[in-house]
Amino acid sequence: MALTPKRVAFFDVDNTLMRGSSLFFLSKGMYQRGFFTKKDISNFVMANLRYRLSGVENKEEIAKIQGAACEFFRGHEAAVIEKMGIEVYDEYVSPALWQGTIEIANNHLDHDEEVWLVTATPKDLADLIAKRLGFTGALGTVAEVKDGVYTGKLIGQLLHGPNKAIAVKLLAEERGIDLANSYAYSDSHHDIPLLQAVGNPRAINPDTLLQIHALREHWPIHDFRRMRALKKIAAPVLGRLVKLGTLLSPRSWRRGR
């Protein structure tokens, strides 16, 4: 008897599942622990910034980011980086999670649907995030390890852009996933190939180009950035109103007599 194809939800990580760059948080943790210099981290930040501001696929910039990321790990023991990844998750990643995205992911889990992360982030870190959140698994960029030490090379390509769609299709073949009935969530126009690979694409905190594309294609859009901004504005205002209400209460008047 043939198994019924699975419906799965795929989530990008940076700015979709969490605010900011997971790789940047890991590199920050490594810098704070003396693994490399300010120059090392600044080179990565500049390469990442140029890529994010470019708005277009630039293979040279992607190669620079790939090279910078590989250099972070070269010569370090995998076990040490794994331990540090746990600390970085607790210090930086967990507080940066978008709770709205977590709720969406948990809703899929509640309906017995697998949840997979699909990210350019190193797979070791992506696996850790997925495990801590109770997700099914993760697809990420694979860093080569020999004799327990990172070599500074990648196995395969950076999991970025069209490569995400390719990886998801391969996973679907391996696990009997029904992509036409599955979901994908991302913030970036670079992930449009991933979103187009499933029957239910969704934009979360979309960049300008993805928002335009999503509106044109009538894809649902979730924007948790606005909700967070409103909470920041509303909290002090609400505090002032509560204080004012206390001052104007009859009990306050009686105390003032």
Language-model features and meaning:
Residues D14-L17, Q32, F72, L159, ...:
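Short N-terminal micro-motifs specific to bacterial/archaeal maturation
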Residues L23, M46, K64-Q66, G148-K153:
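Acidic/polar active-site rim loop that often engages polyanionic ligands
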